[in-house]
A protein has these predicted regions:
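Divalent metal-dependent phosphate-bond-processing catalytic cores, especially two-metal-ion Mg2+/Mn2+ enzymes
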Residues: 1-217
C-alpha cells in the first residue's frame, strides 16, 4: 500500500479527503466551487503537513527548512518557506510532550512505550518482526531518549528556534527534561558499578573463606 512509503500518514490524509466528499462533511464545498485554485492550494498544503509527521523524513525536512531560511525571498520561495515553516510547526507539535514539565512528559513517554509494545506484540502474533523500539524484550522509547534528543529533537526544535526566537521557552523545557535523562543515566551507571563492586567483594570474601578452609584442612 502506498508503495510502502509513509503508509500511515498517506492513509490518514487519503481517508480525510474521502470524508470531505460526503456532503455532510464537506465544509470546503464553497471554496471548491468558487475558488478552485485556493482549494488546490489547501489540499496541497494539507497533504504536505500530514506527510511531514512521518519521522522517516525528519532529517530531510529540517535540512530543507534550514536552506529555505537562507534563500532569496521571491514569491515562489515565500510559498515554500511558508509551507516548510508549517511543517516544522506540526512536527514540533507532534512531539509537544517533550516540552512539558517532567512529570507530565514522563507519563506521555510511558504511554507511548506501551503503545509501541502493544503494536510489537500484534506484529509478532502475525508472524512479523517487531518494528524498531516495539519489541518488549529490548529497550523501548523510555530507555532511548538521550539518543532521540540528540539526533532528532534538538536539531528539529533548534532549527525552528533559530528562525523563531519565541520558541525559547520550549528549548528551556527540552533542556530540563534532557538533563533529567542524563542524570538518570548517571545514576543507572553508578548503580551498575556499585552492584559490580558488591558482587566482586562477595566473590573475594567467598574466595578468602574457601582458601582458609583449604589451609585448615
Amino acid at each position: 500500500m502506498y508503495n510502502d512509503k509513509s503508509v500511515n500518514e498517506n492513509h490518514h490524509i487519503a481517508s480525510s479527503f474521502c470524508m470531505l466528499r460526503r456532503p455532510e462533511c464537506n465544509f470546503l464545498c464553497d471554496l471548491m466551487s468558487t475558488e478552485p485554485s485556493s482549494y488546490r492550494q489547501f489540499r496541497e498544503l494539507a497533504i504536505d503537513l500530514v506527510l511531514a509527521t512521518d519521522m522517516a523524513v525528519n532529517g530531510q525536512i529540517v535540512k530543507a527548512f534550514k536552506s529555505s531560511q537562507d534563500a532569496a525571498a521571491d514569491e515562489t520561495t515565500k510559498n515554500k518557506q511558508g509551507s516548510l515553516m508549517l511543517q516544522m510547526g506540526i512536527k514540533c507539535a507532534d512531539l509537544g510532550h517533550l516540552t512539558l514539565e517532567w512529570d507530565t512528559h514522563s507519563q506521555w513517554v510511558q504511554l507511548l512505550e506501551e503503545e509501541f509494545f502493544a503494536q510489537g506484540d500484534w506484529e509478532m502474533q502475525l508472524g512479523l518482526q517487531p518494528s524498531f523500539l516495539m519489541d518488549r524484550s529490548k529497550p523501548g522509547p523510555s530507555k532511548t531518549q538521550i539518543g532521540f534528543f540528540n539526533f532528532v529533537v534538538f536539531p528539529l526544535f533548534g532549527s525552528l528556534h533559530a528562525a523563531v526566537p519565541a520558541v525559547a521557552p520550549m528549548m528551556d523545557a527540552l533542556n530540563d527534561n534532557f538533563t533529567r535523562y542524563k542524570q538518570y543515566e548517571i545514576v543507572q551507571k553508578l548503580g551498575g558499578l556499585v552492584w559490580k563492586a558488591l558482587n566482586k567483594e562477595k566473590q573475594d570474601i567467598r574466595m578468602s573463606v574457601t582458601t582458609k578452609m583449604i589451609i585448615a584442612v
